[in-house]
């Protein structure tokens, strides 16, 4: 639980980073796009189909935007919740959800990037609501971990998502994978054990809550694959975000009022003396939405496999950038552990791909 507290802005020329952290970006998994009729809009953005831009340049720009938004939201979250002194991770997560709801509505209803889909039944509504609850748990835990562990360690923990996905898939659906797939998970786990034992800024609570965030992302992925299976209930990723975001904001509201009850008063008082906080929160919330938008665009212009490969690279890049900017201490063993985990994730992806090909024959 994160207690409400008064504002404390840290002004240090060379701060120590023994309690730094970061969180996974606010993001939803991309399900398969159901069949639908194409939609057009006079405001449809140029980045979806621009005859004047080379496809190669367009794809490169989208990938660059994807990297920028994913790493940017991590660094902004870290700066706000630790260095700037904004100690309200639940409220921050709620602003992310409100931003995603507003931007999703504009992008779908006005810009027409994808056709609007509607919730067709009470059962479908309850399914999306359950996903929103898991979504909240994952993101709030990730944001809370900002205050305790560094970005690099957070990304190492986040890379273990395939392990938790395999565990939940077995526990919930009794689905088993090939021996090769399970063996590939060994370096995923052993790498994070190695990194944890040699992490200079290790914090037990930060570690546990970051693990909870990673497990929550995996659980959401598995549950989403189970409850949104029928063609009539499948939603495009952008439509799913459109409905999940406001539900998540409503779920978070009572928690932020109870746990962080003085956040609005503190925010108003702070804004009077330092208006920068308003721009930081607005920018942070916007970048949080851009993570989801660029996720969709990368998949549209490349493939889901490309997105998976980029995700593996993003963890390493984000960790490196955070060390350069915030200069949190790292060790050779910690770097080696992170590398082993990333290698395990790559091996896991390849093993699953081969397993699927064998099952299709």
UniProtKB/Swiss-Prot annotation:
Keywords: Acetylation, Membrane, Sugar transport, Transmembrane, Transmembrane helix, Transport
Residues that bear N-acetylvaline: 2
Keyword Transport annotated: yes
UniProt xrefs under Pfam families: TPT
Gene Ontology CC entries for this record: membrane
Major localization class: membrane
Membrane topology field: Multi-pass membrane protein
Transmembrane residue ranges: 56-76, 90-110, 125-145, 153-173, 192-212, 240-260, 276-296, 306-326, 329-349
InterPro entries: Sugar_P_trans_dom, TPT_transporter
Subcellular locations according to the entry: Membrane
Boundaries of every EamA domain copy: 89-196
Family per similarity comment: Belongs to the TPT transporter family. TPT (TC 2.A.7.9) subfamily.
UniProt protein name: Probable sugar phosphate/phosphate translocator At1g12500
Organism: Arabidopsis thaliana
